[in-house]
């Protein structure tokens, strides 16, 4: 600026003014020098004056720029403040009004009138507090008992940095403070004009825009029901013209609601979600169930209190309700116990969440204190399809939190048994706490408890540290996931002589012929011995040394229990059989044909007067899960004709093993209960079931039977086929199938292939003949790669691996 100002003045100082042309007389005289110097002096004085003002101008300019910057920053900062919608849901109790049935019908004039007044009251209440600045919108969507309860939601538009400050607890406290401040006030308060709101009956919960959208989508099919104490209320089914419905359920104040859901169709795609509040708040979801679940045909769900919501989402269109809902109020069950255990090693009782097998409720807390009789013992907890894992840092347990000896563990649903072993180091006992950390719950939890010897936790067996279970050791099957039960074995799946650790095959033990150097294999054959991997356990819980003593015609147990239930496994007088031969009538009298609409689907075996065993994968499709579809034929030989010895049955019950996993084929076993008992004959009689300790020696030749295809990809056979196969060592088969073979599986076949089961044989029996002449069920046709391919064996469900479940169901 100074240079520019100076340059503009330079011509004035350096360019003297000259009179234009000539004077009046036309003689052209110059101007007087004095005038010129005077003008120049004045110009210099003015320039120096301007120069003195320059700092002031600069200062003013800087002030203007700074002010503009501050204002610009302020306004830009203000505009950058992000406003967010904070959604709340809740309820309030009105003391001077009463609920009526008209308020359950959203289309009624009473509902519309009450809603308008209640919404006005709610808005006035909120805007009377410091929240009024942020008020956006609100809605009262339903009413309930109590004398009158209003259910609502509202939205506050707040700066993002204040979002965490306005938690539901803070908002509720502000509203309660406002209500309390006007209780005894004589001044007119707008929101108290028509409603006397109970401050203690106000509840505020966190919600979301998504929750409100879900709620609004159900209001066209909204049902409110109050169920009284001692009442079981069956709920009206959904409106099939709607895509979604909501049942708003309420019971007496001091009770909790129990909802029962029963699926009525074999197949559907409907979704039901249960909430621990009056509306569909995602953070208060108890559980969701989908599509006519076969695994859970009946579900019972507990709320934490007297309010529950059930939301239905339509799946496939149907003229029939795919489910039945009923609800009842129940009393709170205490979940605390103090127990002193007896001085014995078996299971001594059961602990469970309230109303087991109902889903445990949100806010469940159980505390069990158990005292052991001696420090020689530890406490064992045996779970069914449930395991305990170490809790991850700062993450809640979604399936129940356990606290045991200051250890925090999370529950986890699994398709396996599991045991938790707790060492005891003090006589004070052990306290076990179970807590539902979040609203999302699951099926009720049950655990068997008992003692174990801390110095010898698994007598005669191996303690698997992975799952806490006692498993057979050195039997040729890796029962423990890490395989440690089969390491360091001197004699694997054989008998070890005491004298020199020589190994002899098990069938040579107690056979009357000494094989060990000093005859130790023939010692203690007529007396009880400690129980072990291959010892047979009698009904009196004693064990005998002789392998496979069942039904051999000679009592080995003191109580004779090894010779009981032996009317089985005898042949008459005489989906997958490749390289086989046609069977004769009565040759395999336990063989079953499972048919749907006259078409053979799977094989099976008769194991008791009303029970047939088969593979679970025969029913894995929803369309095959209904018992009414199936007909069971026994004594059948030819598929296209009947003979006098064959009989047919309908199915009254279908039970899949609870641990069955479709992808891995693990626990591939199912039981069918027949609609009436069989009449035994030469053509119809059961096969023998092996004990858990029964040993099927690798290399043993056994037989499979069925109507399966005679070659891979071919049609099923018309005649019942039979073929002999050889039992394969577990390690070899597991290697062939890249370690997908589980301890509940066994393999049979030949390296060269050719003889194998095939499509249509699934569920059919693999039977082995004992020295007594009786046939024992070793396996069920399950899976394999192709049919009769070289270097691939057939894989079968190992009956000894699932025999405990079979006996539990059948007996």
From Swiss-Prot:
This is Transmembrane protease serine 6. Coiled coil: none annotated. Changing residue 118 to D: In IRIDA; results in reduced inhibition of HAMP promoter. GO terms for molecular function: metalloendopeptidase activity; serine-type endopeptidase activity. Residues 84-209 form the SEA domain. Membrane-bound serine protease. Through the cleavage of cell surface hemojuvelin (HJV), a regulator of the expression of the iron absorption-regulating hormone hepicidin/HAMP, plays a role in iron homeostasis. Changing residue 223 to H: In a breast cancer sample; somatic mutation. Its EC number is 3.4.21.-. Gene3D superfamilies: Low-density Lipoprotein Receptor (4.10.400.10), SEA domain (3.30.70.960), Spermadhesin, CUB domain (2.60.120.290), Trypsin-like serine proteases (2.40.10.10). GO terms for biological process: BMP signaling pathway; collagen catabolic process; extracellular matrix disassembly; intracellular iron ion homeostasis; membrane protein proteolysis; multicellular organismal-level iron ion homeostasis; negative regulation of BMP signaling pathway; negative regulation of DNA-templated transcription. Changing residue 114 to K: In IRIDA; does not undergo proteolytic processing; loss of activity. It is a single-pass type II membrane protein. Interacts with HJV. PANTHER family: ACROSIN-RELATED, LOW QUALITY PROTEIN: TRANSMEMBRANE PROTEASE SERINE 6. Cytoplasmic domain mediates HAMP suppression via proximal promoter element(s). Residues 213-336, 335-452 form the CUB domain. The active site is at residues 617, 668, 762. Glycans are attached at residues 136, 184, 216, 338, 433, 453, 518. It comes from the Eukaryota. GO terms for cellular component: extracellular space; plasma membrane.
């Amino acid at each position: 600026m100074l240079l520019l100002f100076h340059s503009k003045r330079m011509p004035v100082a350096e360019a003297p003014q000259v009179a234009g042309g000539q004077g009046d007389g036309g003689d052209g005289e110059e101007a007087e020098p004095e005038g010129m110097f005077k003008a120049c002096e004045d110009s210099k004085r003015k320039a120096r004056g301007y120069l003195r003002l320059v700092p002031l101008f600069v200062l003013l300019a800087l002030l203007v720029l700074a002010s503009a910057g501050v204002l610009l920053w302020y306004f830009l900062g203000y505009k950058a403040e992000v406003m967010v919608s904070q959604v709340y849901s809740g309820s309030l109790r009105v003391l001077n009004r009463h609920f009526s049935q008209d308020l359950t019908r959203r289309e009624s004039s009473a509902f519309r009138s009450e809603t308008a007044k209640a919404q006005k009251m709610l808005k006035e209440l909120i805007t009377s507090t410091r929240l009024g600045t942020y008020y956006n919108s609100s809605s009262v969507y339903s009413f309930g008992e109590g004398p009158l309860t209003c259910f609502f939601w509202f939205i506050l538009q707040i700066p993002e940095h204040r979002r965490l400050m306005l938690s539901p607890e803070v908002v509720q406290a502000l509203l309660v403070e406002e209500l309390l401040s006007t209780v005894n006030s004589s001044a007119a308060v707008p929101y108290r004009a028509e409603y006397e709101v109970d401050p203690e009956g106000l509840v505020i919960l966190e919600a979301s825009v998504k929750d409100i959208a879900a709620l609004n989508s159900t209001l066209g099919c909204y049902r409110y029901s109050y169920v009284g104490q001692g009442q079981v209320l069956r709920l009206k089914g959904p409106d099939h013209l709607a895509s979604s419905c909501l049942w708003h359920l309420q019971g007496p104040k001091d009770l909790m609601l129990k909802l029962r859901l029963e699926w009525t169709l074999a197949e559907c795609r409907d979704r039901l979600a249960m909430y621990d509040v009056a509306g569909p708040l995602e953070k208060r979801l108890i559980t969701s169930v989908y599509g006519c679940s076969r695994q859970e045909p009946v579900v019972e769900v507990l709320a934490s209190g007297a309010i529950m919501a059930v939301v239905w989402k339509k799946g496939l269109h149907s003229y029939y309700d795919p489910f039945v809902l009923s609800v009842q109020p129940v009393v709170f069950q205490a979940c605390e116990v103090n127990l002193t255990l007896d001085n014995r090693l078996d299971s001594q009782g059961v602990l469970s969440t309230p109303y087991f097998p109902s889903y445990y409720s949100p806010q469940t807390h159980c505390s069990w204190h158990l005292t052991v009789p001696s420090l020689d013992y530890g406490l064992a907890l045996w779970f069914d399809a449930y395991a305990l894992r170490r809790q991850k840092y700062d993450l809640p347990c979604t399936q129940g939190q356990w606290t045991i000896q200051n250890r925090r563990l999370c529950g986890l649903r699994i398709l396996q048994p599991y045991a938790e072993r707790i060492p005891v180091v003090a006589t004070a006992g052990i306290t076990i706490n179970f807590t539902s950390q979040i609203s999302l719950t699951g099926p009720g939890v049950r655990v068997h408890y008992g003692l174990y010897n801390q110095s010898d936790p698994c007598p005669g067996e191996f303690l698997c540290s992975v799952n806490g279970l006692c498993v057979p050791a050195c039997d040729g099957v890796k029962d423990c996931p890490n395989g440690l039960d089969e390491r360091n074995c001197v004699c694997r799946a054989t008998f070890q002589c005491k004298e020199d650790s020589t190994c002899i095959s098990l069938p040579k033990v107690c056979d009357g012929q000494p094989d060990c150097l000093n005859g130790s294999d023939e010692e203690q054959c007529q007396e009880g011995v400690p129980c072990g991997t291959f010892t047979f356990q009698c009904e009196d819980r004693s064990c005998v040394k002789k392998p496979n003593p069942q039904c051999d015609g000679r009592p080995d147990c003191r109580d004779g229990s090894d010779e009981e239930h032996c009317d089985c496994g005898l042949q008459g007088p005489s989906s997958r059989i490749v390289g086989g031969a046609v069977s004769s009538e009565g040759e395999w009298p336990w063989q079953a044909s499972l048919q749907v609409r006259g078409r053979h689907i799977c094989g099976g075996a008769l194991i008791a007067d009303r029970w047939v065993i088969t593979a679970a994968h025969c029913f894995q499709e929803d369309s095959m899960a209904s018992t009414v579809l199936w007909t069971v034929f026994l004594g059948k030989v030819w598929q296209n004709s009947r003979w006098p010895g064959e009989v047919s049955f309908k199915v009254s019950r279908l039970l899949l093993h609870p641990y069955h996993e479709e992808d891995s084929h693990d626990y591939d076993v199912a039981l069918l209960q027949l609609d009436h008992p069989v009449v035994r004959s030469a053509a119809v009689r059961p096969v023998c079931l092996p004990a858990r300790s029964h040993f099927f020696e690798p290399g043993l030749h056994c037989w499979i039977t069925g109507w399966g295809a005679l070659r891979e990809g071919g049609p099923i056979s018309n005649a019942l086929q039979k073929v002999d196969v050889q039992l394969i060592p577990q390690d070899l088969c597991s290697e062939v199938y890249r370690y997908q073979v589980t301890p509940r599986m066994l393999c049979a076949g030949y390296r060269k292939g050719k003889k194998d089961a095939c499509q249509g044989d699934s569920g059919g029996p693999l039977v082995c003949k004992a020295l007594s002449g009786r046939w024992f069920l070793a396996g069920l046709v399950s899976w394999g790669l192709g049919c009769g391919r070289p270097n691939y064996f057939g894989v079968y469900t190992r009956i000894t691996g699932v025999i405990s479940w079979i006996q539990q169901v059948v007996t």
